[in-house]
């Protein structure tokens, strides 16, 4: 069947009417039979391993379990496409229809939807203008509610009555001289449905607008809240009584699968257990109503049905959580949808993509700002197609299979080819949450040992990253255009300024500031080798590396260049004349030797190996 392109502007989520829910699951077969209602709690027949008819995996309702084959086996093969078997009523089609065909359960008694009853705010309580506690008392069969007080002087509309009060009123109604006829009292979700049906939304909306104009403070805020809910119902053309369910949709069986394990046992989705509880209780309630069982038994069964539906929709929202084997709470429909591991965040918003990887980040201070350290293990996996292509093209490997074998064996040739492939091929690094465009940047990969991604410390502020266990994702741009775009627009060395403020975002912080401070700090406690003289800067560094001079020890180093020294007096602290006519002037941080006519012969600077290292690093960076 050709797929039709359906254009739409937006997706709207609204309340579904009972008719709409039936429509989702109901289908009419060519013989006129209407199917869709799930009436049996059975899943599959454990002898034949075929789905039970009218059960939770019924082939008549949801479609065939095997390709082009009906339940009884009368029709097999694709040539019978579209035929509905006269014997078993199963349409001969592909089993993938079991991923979207729905069913429904017709409830023997109305049930309140737990989202609208126990959600925050409780929309049922807001619409009825009753406290949530009172609404719960009605739904779970603890209190009666007055639906029609008629001419009784002591009763009011929506008033709650306990068992004793209702029995007292019943006695008054059935007394011989009584003129009380029209009094109506209800309990359970049926009573709630009646109250919601009696609501005239347009009238309520008008009345509330008048009341809001006259009131203020807390009362006004409460009225506005109620008006907003009523206006939303009017706007979406939904009816309040739809918050009480008469029909429950059954999601397609392939979305709640049952699979056979090696030992012959079955693993099943939690939803099947929850649906089974609902069907069992619903069937038992229908049977009790048929045989006109005592009211107290019927009422208890209705309460149990309400609790079963609550558990199916949102297990644990109210009352005891339904648990399965090992005391593990069963996963309800809400649990599947909500949260980080739910359908939206896990599968729809954040899909797994090919040519991507993820690992912990560690600092790579030896990297250039536009580079990142990519673990070899990760790189060979991400760049595999490029490596295979290069192997076949240049290294007399005949086919992909051969190339893959080389990769699996970790042949030394592979690493040389990988080095060639990644040269000039940028990768993109992303750290969640990506709050601005600098949350994903391009880097040139450098192969490193280990399993951690190395990141230049200066790009951390842009990613809001630190090295306490943060993870980052790597993505490989595949096409030439994507690579060019990554290099031109996204390379880290081109994203120096914040797009939001225009201020530099690549600023040294934390470890780098501490390192700079430590190199240049004064430390009177570490003065090993202090006072020594060195012919040049390299000699001083070598002495430090050999351990004969401390990092912070004050030493004299010959340096004939210009020296800027703040806080140093122009007048020397001492002047010493030598026999050869030369003069040595000693300042706070310098010692200069001059001829008689003032010509400089040599200059020694008082510094520390740490400061020499800092100076060399800055100079090298500026030159390159």
From Swiss-Prot:
One of its GO terms (molecular function) is magnesium ion binding. Binds 1 Mg(2+) ion per subunit. One of its GO terms (cellular component) is DNA-directed RNA polymerase complex. GO terms for biological process: DNA-templated transcription. This is DNA-directed RNA polymerase subunit gamma. In cyanobacteria the RNAP catalytic core is composed of 2 alpha, 1 beta, 1 beta', 1 gamma and 1 omega subunit. When a sigma factor is associated with the core the holoenzyme is formed, which can initiate transcription. It comes from the Bacteria. Belongs to the RNA polymerase beta' chain family. RpoC1 subfamily. It comes from Synechococcus sp. (strain ATCC 27144 / PCC 6301 / SAUG 1402/1). Its EC number is 2.7.7.6. Zn(2+) binds at residues 70, 72, 85, 88. Its cofactor is Mg(2+); Zn(2+). Keywords: DNA-directed RNA polymerase, Magnesium, Metal-binding, Nucleotidyltransferase, Transcription, Transferase, Zinc. Pfam families: RNA_pol_Rpb1_1, RNA_pol_Rpb1_2, RNA_pol_Rpb1_3.
């Amino acid at each position: 069947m050709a797929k039709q392109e359906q254009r739409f502007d937006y997706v709207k989520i609204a309340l579904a009417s009972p008719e709409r829910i039936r429509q989702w699951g109901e289908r009419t077969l060519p013989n006129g039979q209407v199917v869709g209602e799930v009436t049996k709690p059975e899943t599959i027949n454990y002898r034949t391993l075929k789905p039970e008819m009218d059960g939770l995996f019924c082939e008549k309702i949801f479609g065939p379990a095997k390709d082009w084959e009906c339940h009884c086996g009368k029709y097999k093969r694709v040539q019978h496409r579209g035929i509905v078997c006269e014997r078993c009523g199963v349409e001969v089609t592909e089993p993938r229809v079991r991923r979207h065909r729905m069913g429904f359960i017709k409830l023997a008694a109305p049930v309140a939807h737990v989202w609208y009853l126990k959600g925050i705010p409780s929309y049922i309580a807001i619409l009825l203008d009753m406290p949530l506690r009172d609404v719960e008392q009605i739904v779970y069969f603890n209190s009666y509610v007055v639906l029609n007080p008629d001419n009784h002087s002591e009763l009011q509309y929506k008033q709650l009555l306990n068992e004793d009060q209702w029995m007292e009123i019943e006695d008054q109604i059935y007394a011989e001289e009584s003129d009380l006829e029209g009094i109506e009292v209800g309990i359970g979700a049926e009573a709630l449905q009646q109250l919601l049906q009696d609501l005239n939304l347009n009238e309520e909306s008008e009345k509330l607008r008048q009341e809001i104009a006259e009131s203020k403070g807390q009362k006004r805020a409460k009225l506005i809240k109620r008006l907003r809910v009523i206006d939303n119902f009017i706007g979406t053309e939904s009816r309040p009584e739809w918050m009480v369910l008469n029909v429950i949709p059954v999601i397609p069986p392939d979305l709640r699968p049952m699979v056979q394990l090696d030992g012959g046992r079955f693993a099943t989705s939690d939803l099947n257990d929850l649906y089974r509880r609902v069907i069992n209780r619903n069937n038992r309630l229908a049977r009790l109503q048929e045989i006109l069982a005592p009211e107290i038994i019927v009422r208890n069964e209705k309460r149990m049905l309400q609790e079963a539906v609550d558990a199916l929709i949102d297990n644990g929202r109210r009352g005891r959580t339904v648990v399965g084997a090992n005391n593990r709470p069963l996963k309800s429909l809400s649990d599947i949808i909500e949260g980080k591991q739910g359908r939206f965040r896990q599968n729809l918003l954040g899909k797994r993509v090919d040519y991507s990887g993820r690992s912990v980040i560690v600092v790579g201070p030896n990297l250039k700002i536009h580079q990142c350290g990519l673990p070899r293990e990760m790189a060979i996996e991400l760049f595999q197609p490029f490596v295979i292509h290069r192997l076949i093209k240049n290294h007399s490997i005949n086919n992909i299979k051969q190339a893959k074998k080389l990769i699996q064996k970790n042949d030394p040739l592979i690493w040389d080819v990988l080095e060639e492939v990644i040269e000039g091929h940028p990768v993109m690094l992303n750290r969640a949450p990506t709050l601005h465009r600098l949350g994903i940047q391009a880097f040139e990969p450098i192969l490193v040992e280990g399993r951690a991604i190395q990141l230049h410390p200066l790009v951390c502020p842009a990613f809001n990253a630190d090295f306490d266990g943060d993870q980052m994702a790597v993505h490989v741009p595949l096409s030439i255009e994507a690579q060019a775009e990554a290099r031109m627009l996204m390379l880290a060395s081109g994203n120096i300024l914040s797009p939001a403020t225009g201020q530099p975002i690549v600023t040294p912080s934390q470890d780098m500031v501490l390192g700079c401070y430590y190199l240049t700090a004064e430390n009177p406690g570490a003065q090993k080798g202090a006072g020594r003289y060195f012919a040049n800067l390299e000699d001083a560094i070598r002495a430090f590396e050999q351990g004969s001079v401390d990092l912070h020890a004050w030493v004299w180093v010959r340096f004939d260049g210009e020296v800027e020294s703040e806080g140093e007096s122009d007048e020397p602290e001492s002047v010493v004349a030598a026999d050869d006519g030369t003069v040595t002037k000693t300042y706070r941080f310098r010692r200069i030797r001059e001829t008689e006519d003032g010509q400089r012969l040599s200059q020694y600077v008082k510094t520390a190996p740490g400061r020499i290292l800092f100076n060399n690093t800055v100079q090298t960076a500026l030159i390159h």
